[in-house]
Amino acid sequence: MSNAPFPIDPELTAIAIAYRNGRMIADEVLPRVPVGKQEFKYWKYDLAQGFTVPETLVGRKSKPNEVEFSATDETSSTEDHGLDAPVPQADIDNAPTNYNPLGHATEQTTNLILLDREARTSKLVFNPNSYAAGNKRTLSGTDQWSDPASNPLPEITDALDSVILRPNIGVLGRRTATILRRHPKIVKAYNGTLGDEGMVPMAFLQELLELEAIYVGEARLNIARPGQNPSLIRAWGPHASFIYRDRLADTRNGTTFGLTGQWGDRVSGSIADPNIGLRGGQRVRVGESVKELVTAPDLGFFFENAVAA
């Protein structure tokens, strides 16, 4: 990267790579997979092949039946996502001891890059079009889990059992998670004869649904135009998704609901800019090249409007 027009700073790049916002779940839901070039190919498998049993009986002198596993070659490309943060030279010169304005700008800019990825991931995962025709349901009225008379447990478990590979993780919006944890029928399952009021631990809900993990989307987005008062909405809406995730899957091997192709590492650097304030300054840039993909729509089930907004 030393020949790049915008100089890459190893120290700032290390900050950008190491930065983690624990309240964002995109990397868990659609894990990052390295790709060799910006344009890459990935395979879409015919899932029926893995479940269609051929004749395996072989006669004493006959030839065994042959099987062939085929896949559809799909082409995609990573997209560059980056932001600049101008840092006035005056801020650098007057920074207190142990405070690095460029490092701080890198962290804040990285957070926005990750927030944008969170929004893209939620739009993909919480989208009915990302799921096979029979693997989605829109709830309304008394069917929504926010209605105490609803019965989410059999609905969810029946949906999980209907997927060709039973989902192993759940993805919930914050309101969906909270309402499920205090739903009287789920609380009753936890309390037994002690009543149906209270709130069950998330670990109990995970165990009850036989999932490896449940991820709750916490991120909020400001949808107000520049100059207007902030208007915050949840990146992960009042929905619920249950998907099969294989962390070992990549663009060529393994079967998983979705993944994120990543070309290279996240990068960061700074360059002098004489047009920042009176004394100029440094322009900090953070970016990454990624593409979020759903590779197996059959391996998930989506409840749209699982709870009232």
UniProtKB/Swiss-Prot annotation:
Consequence the record notes for mutating N191H: Escapes CBASS defense in P.aeruginosa strain PAO1
Chain segments carrying region Disordered: 64-83
Stored InterPro entries: Lambda_capsid_assembly
Keyword Heme annotated: no
Role, per record: Probably the major capsid protein.
Subunit (UniProt): Multimerizes.
Name under which the protein is recorded: Major capsid protein
